Structures are given as structure tokens and as C-alpha cells.
């Protein structure tokens, strides 16, 4: 955890996609990164085995009945270790992206994918943007609803 430096605090509610009964509400400072948000979600959902991840932020909604533009993707820094000739340069490094840089606002939604193999999809909503609390330690978990499902299904031998 780190001590407050940014003047903004972002309160984010994250739930497992398709299950509003399992959610975590987390607060982070504006100078923390999407990688910090990933680490907070990882811990809040009782995960133990690290995997790649990406955040997806819609650029703008499409007109009714049409798809909007491709969302901006912010992904794990490990994805940039080796050049990918097929990369269309549309991905951004989550560890280099501060929450303040995203200009988040209450009600804004995003998606978070953890583990590209098992595809743990989450839905996120910015619940509030508040003044940060001086000398507070971030990221605190403000609310935890429902039990986290196991990261891996039990295998019968």
C-alpha cells in the first residue's frame, strides 16, 4: 500500500460478469495505475496464481443498435516484453497508465479480463470520484459482497 499523493480518490465497484452477487468495491488514488487496480482486484477476489490481464474502456457508445468503436485496451506490462509484428499498436501498458490520466467519471464502465485462458471477465463501474484522504493508505477494499469462486475448478482424480 502507498500513502496518498493525488488529490483524487476513485471508488470502483468490480463484479464478476454475469453475477452481481459477487462484487468488490475498491478505492484508489489518482496517481495509482491500472496495474495497481489489477493487483487490488487480484487480492480482493482471493486469487493466488498470477496471469495476464487487460482492461477495456469504451471510447464512446455506439448509436442504438450499432456497435461503438473498439474499446481502448490497457494490458499487463509483460505483453510488451517482446515485439509482436501483428500488434496494431492499439494496446497500452497498464503499468504506465495512471487513473488520473483516464479522466474517469462517476458512472463510467469498463471491463477487466483476468487470465486469457480461463477468461475471468469482470464489469467495473466508477462509483465516485472524491478528494483523496491525506495520509490514507490505498487501496482499501470498501465493500466485499459474496464469496469469491475458486480460481480453478477442483479436479477429481
Question: What spans do the regions from the language model cover?
Answer:
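Short linear regulatory motifs enriched in tryptophan with gly/pro/ser
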Residues: 1-157
Amino acid at each position: 500500500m502507498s500513502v496518498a499523493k493525488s488529490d483524487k480518490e476513485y471508488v470502483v465497484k468490480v463484479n464478476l460478469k454475469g453475477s452481481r452477487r459477487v462484487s468488490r468495491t475498491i478505492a484508489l488514488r489518482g496517481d495509482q495505475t491500472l496495474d495497481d487496480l489489477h493487483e487490488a482486484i487480484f487480492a480482493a477476489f482471493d486469487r493466488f496464481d498470477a496471469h495476464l490481464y487487460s482492461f477495456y474502456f469504451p471510447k464512446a457508445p455506439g448509436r442504438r443498435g450499432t456497435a461503438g468503436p473498439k474499446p481502448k485496451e490497457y494490458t499487463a506490462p509483460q505483453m510488451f516484453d517482446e515485439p509482436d509484428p501483428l500488434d496494431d499498436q492499439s494496446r497500452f501498458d497498464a503499468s504506465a497508465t495512471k487513473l488520473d490520466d483516464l479522466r474517469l467519471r462517476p458512472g463510467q464502465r469498463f471491463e477487466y479480463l483476468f487470465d486469457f485462458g480461463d477468461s475471468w471477465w469482470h464489469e467495473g463501474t466508477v462509483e465516485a470520484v472524491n478528494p483523496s484522504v491525506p495520509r490514507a493508505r490505498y487501496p482499501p477494499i470498501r465493500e466485499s459482497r459474496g464469496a469469491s469462486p475458486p480460481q480453478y475448478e477442483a479436479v477429481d482424480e
